[in-house]
Structures are given as C-alpha cells and as structure tokens.
Curated annotation (Swiss-Prot):
Main localization of the protein described in the UniProt heading: membrane
Protein name per UniProt: Phospho-N-acetylmuramoyl-pentapeptide-transferase
Gene: mraY
Organism (species): Geobacillus kaustophilus (strain HTA426)
Record keyword ATP-binding present: no
Keywords from the UniProt entry: Cell cycle, Cell division, Cell membrane, Cell shape, Cell wall biogenesis/degradation, Magnesium, Membrane, Metal-binding, Peptidoglycan synthesis, Transferase, Transmembrane, Transmembrane helix
Keyword hit for Magnesium: yes
Length: 324
C-alpha cells in the first residue's frame, strides 16, 4: 500500500541518520573537520567554532538509500526519481567540495562565488536537458487559478533560476542550530502532501525521505548542536526543494511554501542594496535570523519562531493548491 510505504520511507530515513550520526560525528572530530566561524558574525557564535561539519553526508545517504529502496515498491524508479537524485547528489557534491576547502584551509571560506555559481548552473543545465528530453511539460501554472502559459524553452531560464536561487536561499537559512533542519522538514512535508494529492507517489516518497533524514539529523543538530550539515547538506536540500517544485508543476508555490527561505534571502538583498545606496543598514545583521540574535532573542526562540512561520507558510501553500 502506498500509505504504508510513505510511513516506512520516513521511518527508515529517520533511523539511518539517527544510527549513523553517533558513529559519524566522532569520525569527523578525529579528522578535525570542524566549522570555522566568520569573525564578522555574532560574537555568540565563536563558541561554536570547531563543531563538526559536513553532517549533510548522513542526510544524503539516508535520502538516496531510502528513495532507491522504497520507490520501486510502489511506483518504480522513474525519470522523476533520477532527476531528483541528480540534483540532490549533484548539489551535495558541490557543497562537499566547498566544505572540504573550508576545513582544510581552517577558515570560513570555500569555493569562490564564481566557482559555486558555475557548478550550480551546470547541474541545473543538465537537469533541464534531461527534463526537456524526457518530454516533461514547460507549462507554468498559477496556483489557485485556472490559468497557465506554455513558456517553451524560456522555461529553462525559470528552472535555472529556481535551482540556483533555491539552493542559495536555503543555504543562507542554515545559520542557527536546527533552523534549516526544521524549516526544511516542514517545506518538504508540504510538498509530500501535494505530490501525494497529484498521485506522484515517487516524488512523495522522496519528500518524506528528506523529512525523515532531516528530522533524524535534528536530534543532533538542535541547540546546542553536536554537528552541522554544512554546505553539503544545505545546497543539496535547496536544490532538491526547487526540483520537487518543478516536477510537481508547483513552481510558483515554492515562494509560499519556502517563505522562510525567501524572507531570509530578501533580508540579505535589502541589507546590501540599502548599504550600497544610502550607506545605512536596515537590519543589525543579515540574514534575518542574525538580526534577531543581536536584538537579544535567544537562539532557541528564533529557531522555534521561524519553524512556526514556516509551518504557517506550508499550510497556506497546501490550502491554495488543494482547496482554492
């Protein structure tokens, strides 16, 4: 039964990360793969320096293993499944390279912005080439409205923007213990519901595999974090959520379901634009979660608040698509 497979997929993915983490975290410590904290960041973060990073490897292993095991049992391994894994693993590898450079150089710098952008663009281009070759629709639907437009090859521009922008937006959100793991679980959970509602059980299995993986990771990433996912995890999750939005044809709904990621990104854009044009900063620090830190909020209060906002956005997205 598909319903049982969904529950099993989430449970298996959760258990993989929960079982692997106690083994993998000490291994990262022995390798001295600790997070370096940027000097211009909040002073309270300096005590986190040296916390093992690259925990996203465990998330990736759980997602890939669960998807490849459970999906054939209810829907078969489709092109959609392979596309999702292509983006997830591809962006994960890119993040891994970024993290490796950081831990080897012992400073909070990895790939250059240009190198990272080229890598993101290349993976997105491969995704679109396979997507187009496989005959998937290039029609863009307006959520909650009976209106759509066929973008043709221009859809590729939208797709590239979503994958590159999505991975960067999610990456920006990964700044506090448990913040990204929780908001990602909520966003992927919403898309799991919508994919299931469409009968795309393969996509639904992938989504719940992500939910299980990040919730299992959250056990060790909640404040005070014993491990960080690093760019290995954040870039992979960002690319994956964008790919899910594309394959479910709910591209525009990502702005709502991923509302927390959008707000975090906008806070950075507003901060930079304001400083360059007026010499003044709108926020004490960006992304937005750092602003609330400097205002005096506790880390746990910020994280739980952002989770709550993310849940509201997710429910709004489901309401728009299913009931409107």
């Amino acid at each position: 039964m598909p319903e049982q497979a969904i529950v099993i997929a989430m449970a298996v993915s959760f258990l993989i990360t929960v079982v692997l983490s106690p083994l993998f975290i000490p291994f990262l410590r022995r390798l001295k793969f600790g997070q370096s904290i940027r000097e211009e960041g909040p002073k309270s973060h300096q005590k986190k320096s040296g916390t093992p990073t690259m925990g996203g490897i465990m998330i990736l292993l759980a997602i890939v293993a669960t998807t490849l095991w459970i999906t054939p049992k209810i829907a078969g391994l489709s092109t959609r499944t392979y596309l999702l894994l292509l983006v997830t693993v591809g962006y994960g590898v890119l993040g891994f390279l970024d993290d490796m450079i950081k831990v080897v150089m012992k400073r909070n710098l990895g790939l250059t912005s240009r190198q990272k952008f080229i890598g993101q663009l290349l993976i997105a281009a491969i995704f679109f080439a396979v997507y187009r070759q496989s005959g998937f629709s290039t029609v863009l639907h307006i959520p909650g409205a009976d209106w759509s437009v066929d973008l043709g090859w221009a859809y590729g521009v939208l797709l590239l923007f979503m994958l590159v922008g999505g991975s960067n937006a999610v990456n920006l959100t990964d700044g506090l213990d448990g913040l990204l793991a929780g908001t990602a679980a909520i966003a992927f959970g919403a898309y799991a519901v919508l994919a299931w509602n469409q009968g795309q059980y393969d996509v639904a299995v992938f989504c719940v595999a992500v939910v299980g993986a990040v919730l299992g990771f959250l056990v060790f990433n909640a404040h005070p974090a014993k491990v960080f996912m690093g760019d290995t995890g954040s870039l992979a999750l960002g690319g994956a959520i964008a790919a899910v939005a594309v394959l479910t044809k709910l591209e525009l709904l990502l702005v709502i379901i991923g509302g927390v990621f959008v707000i975090e990104t906008l806070s950075v854009i507003i901060q930079v634009a304001s400083f360059k044009t007026t010499g003044r900063r709108v926020f004490r620090m960006s992304p937005l979660h750092h602003h609330y830190e400097l205002v005096g909020w506790s880390e746990w209060r910020i994280v739980v608040t952002f989770w709550a906002v993310g849940l509201l956005f997710a429910m709004l997205g489901i309401y728009i698509e299913v009931w409107m």
